[in-house]
Every structure is written in C-alpha cells, then in structure tokens.
Regions:
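Basic, flexible linker segments flanking DNA-binding modules
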Residues: 1-21, 120, 179-187
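Short small-residue beta-strand/loop micro-motif enriched in glycine and branched aliphatics
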Residues: 53-57, 113-116, 140-142
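RNase H-like two-metal-ion nuclease catalytic core shared by retroviral integrases
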Residues: 4, 91-93, 99-100, 113-137, ...
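Mobile genetic element proteins and their domesticated derivatives, centered on retroelements
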Residues: 13, 30, 46, 52, ...
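An active-site-proximal beta-strand-loop segment
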Residues: 15-63
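C-terminal domain-tail junction helix/linker
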Residues: 107-111, 136-222
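Retroviral integrase
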Residues: 53, 62, 74-77, 104, ...
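Active-site beta-loop-alpha junctions of metal-dependent nucleic acid enzymes
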Residues: 39, 58-82
C-alpha cells in the first residue's frame, strides 16, 4: 500500500508565480551544494520572486548544518520589519524548513508559510532555475574554483550577489536589474497588476485577509 505523505504547509502559490505583483510579496528559499577541489559548501539563499533580488545568503561547510537557514530567515524577518502586508515564504519540505525551531521564528510576524508538495521540486520553479545558472556563473565568470579558503569563497559570493542585484540585466523583468526594478516599483513607474481578479471572485487572496484580520486583532489587544 503506497504511503500517503501529508504536507506540513499547503502550497499557497502553486501556478501563480507570474501573478506576484509587488516586492516582498513572495520570498522563496532553497539550499544548493557547491563543490570544487576539496571544498564543500552548502549555500542557502532567499529570493524575492517579484524583483528577482537575492535578499540574503549564508554558507555552511558541514553537511546538514542548520544555522545558514536560521540566519537567513532572521535576515528576512528584519528586512520585513515595519511592513503591514503579508509575505509568503515558500520552500521545499527539507528538514530544517519543516522544523519547529525554524517556523517558531515567524509566529509573531506577517510571514505566511508555503511549501512545495513532497517530491515535487517543480513546485518551486524560481529556485530550480536560479540555482542552476547562478552556480554556472559563479564558476565561469567569478572563478570560485580558485578560492583557497572559506573567506575567499564568501568574498567571491559577496561580489557576485552585488553584481547580480545591481548590474546584471534580468530577462524576467525586462532586462532591468533587480534592485533598480524594485526602486521603479516604489516610484510608481511600473504598471500595477490585479493579481487575483481574473481567477476568483474575491480579488484579495485568502491568506492576505486572514493575516490582516490577525494583525488587526493583535492591535486591538494592545
């Protein structure tokens, strides 16, 4: 009898990747392994789906280490401080992403958890595509295989992320750079989309109304 796998969190954004309509509305995270010579690194990144920015990254040298996931999530929480709109954080069902310690960090925030279905990496196409060519550019253009220490590796990563966010044209956002695309949004230079209007009667997705109601209840208690 086949085993039924119960997903810890529902996939809130399945098939709606192209309808994300503002910065920080959906953030995705994943871990990828980078190996060369005798070095082994696990690189965990957090991306903004709308702007394509790399919001934060952390590295571990031990297989299965969890600090880089936690540190990245704390970076995201700090980045979102002061905002009053919910943010969906979408990941796969990796053990750290599913852990109590990880998800306890967001219990008092407006971050809503979403997960790919078990065994369905295509539920997170943003990360699946980004990880591949980011690793390719790190080796081809930034020569990370020449780094002889973790410090040199992190310096190369830092330089790459700066290049990626500030200088690298991105096809998905009209060959703009991620940081400039975000700035243009807040200047009102980008057309606003009605994310859910054509798909359901209520133009505001359920997870947004629920989190806003929660935020309102918390303010009333104060």
């Amino acid at each position: 009898k086949p085993r039924k796998v119960k997903d810890k969190y529902p996939n809130l954004i399945y098939s709606t990747w192209d309808t994300v309509d503002r910065p920080r509305q959906v953030i995705v995270s994943d871990m990828t392994v980078i190996k060369y010579s005798w070095f082994f690194f696990e690189l965990t990144m957090y991306f903004d789906v709308f702007t394509k920015e790399i919001l934060t990254w952390h590295v571990a040298e031990r297989r299965g280490h969890r600090d880089q996931y936690i540190d990245g999530l704390n970076d995201v929480i700090n980045l979102l401080k002061g905002t009053d709109e919910p943010t969906v954080l979408h990941t796969d069902q990796g053990s750290v992403y599913a852990s109590l310690a990880y998800n306890e960090l967001i219990k008092d925030t407006l971050i809503v958890r979403s997960m790919s279905r078990a065994g369905k990496p295509t539920d997170n196409p943003v990360n699946e595509s980004l990880n591949g060519w980011i690793k390719e550019e790190l080796f081809i253009d930034f020569k990370i295989e020449t780094c002889n220490s973790r410090e040199e590796f992190e310096e190369a990563l830092d330089a790459y992320v700066d290049y990626y966010n500030e200088k690298r044209p991105c096809y998905a956002i009209g060959y703009d750079t991620p940081n400039n695309y975000r700035k243009r949004f807040y200047k009102g230079e980008l057309p606003r989309k009605d994310t859910f209007g054509k798909r359901e009667a209520n133009a505001t997705p359920k997870f947004v109304t629920e989190r806003k109601k929660m935020a309102g209840n918390e303010k009333n208690k104060e």
